[in-house]
């Protein structure tokens, strides 16, 4: 528009941000019409250490890495401790007898190496880490739990994880992917100390040990013949649990959150055509392709289409949770905008063909407000 704007630089090595928002579902997912969410994000990068923390109370992810040159000692903690009944859905109907409450807490520590890579911004590095893991799993009946549902015992968890990351991505003003790729993988082995007390039944596998592998690729780039304001964006995710070892308690959680941008958030599997919620899957492969247009220097519009193959949790008989293959698709129209008080807004409208509601298509809307301190 012929005017110049001076935007003060952001110290991306020292960031504190608050995200609050919510989603509305149409139709409902089971009995769920919508839900709020919020999280505090902290990132600090010093010469000899770094930390990255996402805190929401019931679900948290904390990491602190001590570095000496390219070597680092990695410490990591995560928990998923939702104090509400968790039920499976069939044809968008909650199967009440499957109701349980359960959660997991996991701590990890181990060595790693990290090297900076082009374009040498704070996110850009290649790292390989080997972590020992110790944690705890708990599960409890609710007033609605079927008498025949086998509930696993509370148990100690321990194992190891191999984690590799590469991030060569350049981000734009709103931290959205602009140019480059990021990729990585995880190989995770866990032993459930008391799982031999089970005999299969409604929980699936009776084996104590399981191996899971995941991988991802996220990218953004220009479109030949169009301006710098036009971007093509894509992401691909895959995950597999060792054969016969999947159950609802160790299944992957496929999320429908916004298109990934922040470096450590890239690895979390998402089906971008879906709304902001988790779906249990024993194995999955998903790909999303989109177009993003910079409407003004602070406003971006994205159009994204998604495809998903997955072995989704469903119910057999009255209360037996099993996994069945599904192939689904979805689409999202999203707007990212700068806002007052050093903040940004995210608004998205999504539709998908039945993975979220296990047999019934539908859509919804998500709104986020992100405040940078």
Report each predicted region and the residues it spans:
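Transmembrane beta-strands of outer-membrane beta-barrel proteins
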Residues: 16-20, 49-55, 71-76, 122-132, ...
């Amino acid at each position: 528009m012929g005017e110049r704007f001076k935007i003060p630089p952001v110290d991306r090595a020292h960031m504190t941000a608050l995200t609050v928002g919510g989603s509305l579902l149409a139709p409902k997912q089971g009995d769920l019409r919508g839900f709020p969410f919020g999280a505090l994000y902290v990132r600090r990068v010093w010469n000899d250490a770094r930390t990255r923390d996402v805190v929401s109370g019931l679900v948290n992810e904390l990491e602190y890495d001590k570095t000496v040159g390219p070597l680092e000692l990695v410490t990591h903690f995560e928990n998923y401790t939702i104090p509400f009944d968790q039920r499976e859905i069939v044809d968008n109907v909650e199967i009440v007898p499957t109701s349980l409450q359960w959660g997991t807490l996991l701590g990890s520590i181990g060595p790693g190496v990290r090297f900076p890579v082009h374009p040498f911004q704070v996110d850009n590095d290649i790292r390989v880490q080997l972590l020992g893991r110790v944690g705890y799993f708990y599960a409890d009946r609710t007033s609605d739990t079927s008498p025949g549902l086998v509930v696993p015992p509370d148990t100690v968890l321990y194992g190891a994880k191999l984690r590799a990351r590469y991030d060569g991505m350049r981000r734009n003003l709103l931290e959205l992917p602009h140019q480059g790729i990021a990729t990585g993988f995880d190989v995770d082995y866990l032993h459930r100390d008391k799982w031999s007390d089970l005999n299969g039944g409604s929980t699936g596998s009776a084996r104590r040990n399981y191996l899971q592998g995941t991988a991802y690729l996220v990218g953004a780039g220009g479109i030949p013949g169009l301006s710098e304001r036009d971007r093509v964006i894509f992401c691909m995710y895959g995950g597999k649990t060792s054969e016969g070892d999947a159950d609802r308690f160790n299944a992957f959680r496929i999320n429908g959150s916004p298109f990934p941008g922040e470096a450590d958030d890239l690895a979390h599997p998402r089906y971008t055509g879906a709304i902001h919620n988790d779906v249990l899957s024993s194995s999955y492969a998903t790909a999303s392709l989109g177009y993003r247009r910079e409407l003004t220097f602070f406003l971006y519009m994205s159009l994204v289409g998604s495809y998903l193959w997955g072995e989704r949790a469903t119910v057999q008989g009255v209360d037996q949770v099993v996994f069945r293959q599904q192939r689904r698709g979805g689409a999202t129209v999203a707007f990212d905008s700068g806002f007052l008080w050093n903040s940004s807004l995210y608004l998205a409208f999504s539709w998908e063909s039945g993975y979220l509601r296990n047999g019934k298509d539908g859509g919804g809307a998500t709104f986020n407000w992100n405040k940078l301190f």
